[in-house]
């Protein structure tokens, strides 16, 4: 007899199982594949988003920045690969540059640390392989990448 049955052991199922394992519960995880992370999780981009996209005031906006912080700690606790590499959103014309300003304002309201707009020269100093027609970039230094398979395995174990 189990207290909780979790169907699927991708990143959501494994995370749920890991969290529930911290309580006095008997947890059963059912997975149709022969290993964890064989569904949608295996095809994800492994990006831990900074939090400038969600519209301010939404649940996603409220949780995104805090979730990013917690993911770094979780990966450290479980010895899972985590690397803060930052991210760019590129603008190729003035209209797109205005959108970067909207994302910057949104990100600041959401509490994203270190977010800023770079001109083309500053962006190329950081990433010399950018296209020649880039006019600006939104830089989010808190964006990161993880090992999603390693995370699922560590949480499932």
What are these regions (language model features)?
Residues 20, 42-45, 62, 103-105, ...:
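Short, glycine/charged-enriched secondary-structure capping and boundary segments
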Residues 33-35, 123, 155:
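Short beta-to-alpha linker loops that shape the active-site pocket of alpha/beta-hydrolase fold enzymes
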Residues 46-126, 135:
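Dinucleotide-binding Rossmann-like beta1-alpha1 core, especially the glycine-rich loop
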Residues 21-43:
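Glycine-rich FAD pyrophosphate-binding loop
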Residues 16, 71, 103, 154-155:
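Aromatic/hydrophobic pocket-lining residues that form π-stacking "cages" and hydrophobic walls in ligand
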Residues 2-29:
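N-terminal Rossmann-like FAD-binding beta1-loop-alpha1 element of flavoenzymes
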Residues 138-157:
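Helical element adjacent to the flavin cofactor pocket in flavoenzyme catalytic cores
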């Amino acid at each position: 007899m189990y207290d909780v049955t979790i169907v699927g052991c991708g990143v959501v199922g494994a995370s749920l199982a890991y969290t529930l394992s911290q309580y006095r519960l008997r947890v059963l995880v059912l997975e149709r594949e022969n290993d964890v992370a064989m569904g949608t999780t295996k095809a994800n981009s492994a990006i831990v988003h900074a939090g400038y996209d969600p519209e301010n005031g939404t649940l996603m906006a409220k949780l995104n920045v805090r979730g990013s912080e917690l993911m770094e700690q979780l990966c450290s606790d479980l010895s899972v690969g985590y690397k803060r590499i930052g991210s760019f959103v590129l603008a190729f014309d003035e209209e797109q540059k205005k959108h970067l300003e909207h994302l910057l304002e949104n990100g600041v309201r959401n509490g994203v640390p270190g977010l800023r707009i770079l001109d083309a020269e500053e962006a190329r100093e950081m990433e010399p392989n950018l296209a020649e027609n880039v006019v600006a970039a939104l830089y989010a230094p808190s964006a990161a990448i993880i090992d999603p398979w390693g995370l699922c395995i560590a949480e499932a174990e």
